[in-house]
From Swiss-Prot:
Residues 537-548 have a biased composition (Basic and acidic residues). The keyword Phosphoprotein applies. Pfam families: La, LARP1_HEAT. It is found in: Cytoplasm, P-body; Cytoplasm, Cytosol. One of its GO terms (molecular function) is RNA cap binding. Residues 1-128, 366-428, 527-649 are annotated as: Disordered. Residues 380-423 have a biased composition (Polar residues). Interacts with XRN4 and facilitates its attachment to polysomes upon heat stress. This is La-related protein 1A. The keyword Oxidoreductase does not apply. Gene3D superfamilies: Winged helix-like DNA-binding domain superfamily/Winged helix DNA-binding domain. Disulfide bonds: none annotated.
Amino acid sequence: MMAETEGSVADDRELITREGGIGTKSPWKTTTSPVETIDAPVMGAHSWPALADAAQQPRPKNPPAPAPAPPSKNIPTSIPIPTPAVTGQAKSKGGGKANPGHKNPSGRHSKPGPRSNQNGPPPPPYLVHAVPYHPPPFPPMVPLPHAAGPDFPYAPYPPYPVPVPPVTESGNEKQVQASPLPPVLPAPQGDPGKPWPHQRGFDPRNMPQGAGPRNFGRPPFMGPAPGFLVGPGPGFPGPVYYLPGPPPGAIRGPYPPRFAPYPVNQGPPILSPEKLDLRDRVLKQVEYYFSDENLENDHYLISLMDEEGWVPTKIIAGFKRVKAMTMDVDFIVYALGFSNSVEVQGDQIRKRDKWSDWIPASKKSTSAETIGDGDKDSPKSITSGDNFGNPSKGSSKPTVSDFSSEGAQSSRTNNYKSGNLKSSADEKRNVEDLSNDFSNTFLLDEELDLEHRSPRKSGLSMSKSIEYEDDDMAVDDQDIQKLVIVTQNSGKSDGAGIGGTEAKNIPKELASTINDGLYYFEQELKKKRSGRRKNNSHLDTKDGKIKSGEGLNTKLGENSAANDGGEEHGIITSRRKQNKGTHKHHTAHARRFFSSNIRNNGNISESPPSSSIGFFFGSTPPDSHGPRLSKLSSSPQCTLSGSSPPVGSLPKSFPPFQHPSHQLLEENGFKQEKYLKYRKRCLNERKKLGSGCSEEMNHLYRFWSYFLRDTFVLSMYDDFQKFALEDAAGNYDYGLECLFRFYSYGLEKHFDEDLYKDFEKLSLDFYHKGNLYGLEKYWAFHHYRGKEEPITKHPELEKLLKEEFRSIDDFRAKETITNQKENKSH
């Protein structure tokens, strides 16, 4: 800077000398007037160093200034002290006085270059002046400050550089300060230019309420432009600019943007060829189950359907063929999703089209047995605990409760009508898959013994066999020998089942399932029995082949079921005829299961049984106590005449099986026992404990009341009447009440003149003894018969019904008065 200043001064003096006509001289020899020396003294001039010394001294470090030039060879090493003239000029320059040479800057530009100090840097080609600062017409764009939340882990961006005008003036060695910037408002939060010395990790708990990291950064709002400076003119909107969104790094908000990748769509799972083959096989198997071809013969599957045709998927998964392929229920449901003939809903499946054609008759009947034994009466009936139903003749809404309780069977209609299910004697099932296991589960031990050990089958000819397809069927004592009782409470008289377990109440839905299971199982036994007869129509003998039943058609069963107990028939049996055994009844789809009724809505004289009971006709041949024996009976492998059977004296449990009824029977403690043995055990218990003290006898009364309504057996009816009257004589009326219910409902189903006369006689007799229950059932029988052919009434009974007992309320009022009198007497 010193050398440059020195060269400028020399050039100026040379210019002045030329303009004044003076020759070129060294400016160091020119003297100034004393006046200037006196007027413009320079402070500290005496302490100035020599020019040569000053040029050799290093300059202070100043990045904007260039390095000092080396001294010229023409300049002597020792430079004299500048004269006062030089001092005055320097003063004039430094004091701010105008230099005459600076008034015409154009002359300087015309110069080709300085003529002295050739080794110095050339002067700029133009005269440098300080550029004045003009503020922009709009406020400067100030970047948004860094607004960071608490515990924000990222450092703020550095401040944006702001351009400033030049800060130095040409020809002046003194540095000029930068022009001040427009005032900037302080940041709302913190100082954006000051980094945080200590920053903690990001803690989501310190996040401001209502704010949080966003998945995608929102681009800045691109609204209409602010308009032109002078306006585009009235009536025209400003232009709208649409710009692409900035890159993610340029978006600055209270939090850095977080970008989540788009989820990758994996698509449907790709099954292996083995899985695809398994899916097709499962689908084909289940579709076959629900095909019309299979349903025509598959009564078991039909029994599993509910009122809408649905079958639980778990049950289908438990079938042998399906279970052998897979036990994954979810995979089965997945496979059925590709079916066109089977539909899936939740955990149930059914036939897609025409499923209503295969609903079991017991679940789609239009006149279900929904009314209790006392449904002819008011639900307020207090005469019997079984009178809990509400009378509703001709109920049109069938429910599964039709087979759920003590009084669940209405005598208005018979739900089991022939033809409701497609079944016949010639129908055959796939015994390899279901029938064998299904039948073997229910066979008694003696049946299994005969099935597995005997190479030849018995050729005994039944005098009258049970043909379930016939609309009219004759049942006699011979058939009773094949009757099997299914009891829930056996061997105990305290209400607990076998082994001390309490009898469980059977829900309505499960009771219907058990009922259907017992019936269809009975059909399976019949088919197996028919198949055995065909295969063994001829037996090999030494003399040749003879018919197995030849000469053996002697009627068996002369020892009636009543004789097993050694009891004598006496009351109202003298006028019974043996043709009563040919009483015709339709039992093609008769009820097989009677669930317990634990509700007691009246002042019954005793507690009704709390356990359920059922039955089916087994295939066990009768005990060999007849005069003639078959070859099978005389075989060493079979029971000898007069000996006790090897098993069957005690109830047998049901092995577990996939059929729902089997599992329910096992879980609820049901046992199977031949009727004749069960009857004998009940009578022995009654004799031991006394009338009214045997719970098993109560079950037997209840069974008789239901069974005889559909299948009349004379010997069974005689037992029923005899023991009920004996208990009533001992002030125990449960058996008698069961008998009256049998009369009322049974006669409405199948009217019989002899039974009707017994009904009238017993009703009148017990009315005179103060018991209104028989008269009430007699009134209900006539009241609910409707407009059928009138029946002649007993004169005294007809008078009572016309004068005193015209409605059920009259019975309730009479019963209340009787109870009040009894309470006062006590």
